[in-house]
């Protein structure tokens, strides 16, 4: 009986975490505004060292979450992205990922 109570409490905890982690498209639209400064420019390259900046509109949501978490933790190295991601909460990351995943990567469509 005790195990059942523990499992029930654990299930409630996990369900509340998933509800919190769900991304909000409209919030992501506001939070992703600065992303377009680099990622919204076709053929954009940042200065030394030169990196091609990928267009991230329409990218897979889970990929975006993993990438932003990697930049936040420092596992992925890019000074600009590390600094940008450092300020993001997990909710911010989810919101931004949901918004960007719903966009197009076709510049002519924008």
Annotate each predicted stretch with a short phrase.
Residues 1-7:
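Bacterial N-terminal signal peptides that target proteins for export
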Residues 15-32, 44, 52, 105, ...:
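Electrostatic cytochrome c docking/interface patches
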Residues 73-76, 84-110:
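C-terminal capping alpha-helices of c-type cytochrome domains
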